[in-house]
Amino acid sequence: MSHHGPRLSTRSQQIVAGYASVAANFDVEKLHREQGVNIPTSGASINQCPHAAAARAAARMADDLASAARAKKSLDAKGSLAGRPVHHKAATESTKAKHTGFDYEAFYKGELAKKHQDKSYRYFNNINRLARKFPVAHTANPRDEVEVWCSNDYLGMGNNPVVLETMHRTLDKYGHGAGGTRNIAGNGAMHLGLERELRLHRKEAALVFSSCYVANDATLSTLGTKLPGCVIFSDTMNHASMIQGMRHSTPKRVIFKHNDLEDLETKLQQYPKETPKIIAFESVYSMCGSIGPVKEICDLAEQYGAITFLDEVHAVGLYGPRGAGVAEHLDYDAHLAAGSSPDPIPGSVMDRIDIITGTLGKSYGAVGGYIAGSEEFVDMIRSYAPGFIFTTSLPPATVAGARASIVYQSEYLGDRQLKQINVREVKRRLAELDIPVVPGSSHIVPVLVGDAALARAASDKLLSEHDIYVQAINYPTVARGEERLRITVTPRHTMEQMEGLIRSLNQVFEELNINRLSDWKLAGGRAGVGIPGAADDVQPIWTDEQIGLLNGTAPRSLRNAEKSVVDMRAVTIARSRFDVLLGPVYGELQPTEDFDTPAVGATFKAPLVDREVAHDITVSA
């Protein structure tokens, strides 16, 4: 401790002023230098050091607790201790213990103070989605119900009746947990069946992870570490999971401007074709709603010897004739004609993508993530990625529900079409009211606010005064000054609910004096809003023909008195996937309240699937 002597002697006035808890602490000194905190050698005040102030407050609290403990001990000495836990005395006395070194609690408090100061502190709302009333949830009070307008359960599959039926049956037969990692007791027929189902992407193999965050992180970190001299090219707006995967590996990282092909090519040109290269990007960017130039990036990858890593998290279930994502959607007619065949379509965009990652936790209403690619690639990740090897596998019921959801959506187009119709309607109404929406071709509806405090206030007002839950999105999820309300419209939102959202949002904008689109135009624009020409070329990726608007087959938005429709053909096929493990199911579904009951007497034929026997299903009274 002798090395502290000289430093303490020059800080005596600081110590007297209440700086004692951090003076001569080199870690805190370094923290001060990084944060720009300057403590003078004389005339110091406790207010100049947030860590000292926090320490003083903690010390006062400790003294109060100690005094209370002494008083309680005195009372206990006079009476019986019967009924008290054995650890009571030790727990009481532990309040007297104090750190004599680094003040950890003050450090934690200081870090949180920074989040509060820049308005990026995250508040979690208590929202409990109701299976029988989607998209309605209750708050902490079960009697207080709100409409949810920011869920990533994009299609309402979290309470689809065939999904719930499958999960209940699986739970009854196989129990709750998986029992271990995939390598030790946690690799079952349900997991293997789900990975076979992910032939949806027409790839040779797939691998399921506990989440797509883990899938992205584990895959990119493993590839980056194993590929010799690898360089990863990353879109500046890539998700945190991809960024973490790159940070956890050893290769050089090159960041290119968002969706900027010219910038990407310029940077690719700087490396020999023989250098291993990965281009990591997304198909749908969730906070702005833009869609990546998937085909054009494939062109550059082939030209410069790179492989492509495409995150389809916010696209699977929503795009393409079978819900395989944007890569499938770009060759819509070819994939529609190919049907459920797992065989690749040579030359298609999806075939040209090397690695696809997706999630089970958004459009499919479950939890988990996955990768899809060549058999050798998937086997290498399975064999080397710690994020896969050392994690308990997903519960069988969850896996079965996810598989049923994928099958249902791959066989039924109506939910995807209706979602697009509702998204178009909400965007149209917002534009009429001059409410600023970040331009994008996808289903995401990002309403620009441009201020963290205002975004939080708007979210709070919508929830407390209008029973509408829309989460504010602040830094670091989006850049400072680009704070927004991210609205997600589902096929289960009714016309009346959409009208209520628009009306309430308009009122909140008026009450909080939030910038309208016209205001952003006068200010020069921000985040693509109010910038001349920024929205000119933005067209929905779903065409009128694909939605069914041209031939009159498009589904119609629901009214409040109407119930969502379950497609019984898709139900039949989804059920058939589990005939071997769970036994065939005949008769009616047990519908949730907001689904129409299947028509009595309807008969459907299930196709041969996974070598399982086709059967007739009759829905009877």
From Swiss-Prot:
SUPFAM superfamilies: PLP-dependent transferases. It is an enzyme of class 2 (transferase). Substrate binds at residues 122, 234, 477. GO terms for molecular function: 5-aminolevulinate synthase activity; pyridoxal phosphate binding. CDD domains: KBL_like. Residues 76-95 are annotated as: Disordered. It comes from the Eukaryota. It catalyses: succinyl-CoA + glycine + H(+) = 5-aminolevulinate + CO2 + CoA. Pathway: Porphyrin-containing compound metabolism; protoporphyrin-IX biosynthesis; 5-aminolevulinate from glycine: step 1/1. Its main location: mitochondrion. Gene3D superfamilies: Aspartate Aminotransferase, domain 1 (3.90.1150.10), Type I PLP-dependent aspartate aminotransferase-like (Major domain) (3.40.640.10). The modification N6-(pyridoxal phosphate)lysine is found at residue 362. Its cofactor is pyridoxal 5'-phosphate. Pyridoxal 5'-phosphate binds at residues 286, 314, 359, 391-392. Keywords: Acyltransferase, Heme biosynthesis, Mitochondrion, Pyridoxal phosphate, Transferase, Transit peptide. InterPro entries: 4pyrrol_synth_NH2levulA_synth, Aminotrans_II_pyridoxalP_BS, Aminotransferase_I/II_large, AON_synthase_class-II, PyrdxlP-dep_Trfase, PyrdxlP-dep_Trfase_major, PyrdxlP-dep_Trfase_small. One of its GO terms (cellular component) is mitochondrial matrix. The keyword Transit peptide applies. It is found in: Mitochondrion matrix. The active site is at residue 362. GO terms for biological process: protoporphyrinogen IX biosynthetic process. Catalyzes the synthesis of 5-aminolevulinate (ALA) from succinyl-CoA and glycine, the first and rate-limiting step in heme biosynthesis. Belongs to the class-II pyridoxal-phosphate-dependent aminotransferase family. Homodimer. This is 5-aminolevulinate synthase, mitochondrial. It comes from Agaricus bisporus (White button mushroom). The lineage of its organism: Eukaryota, Fungi, Dikarya, Basidiomycota, Agaricomycotina.
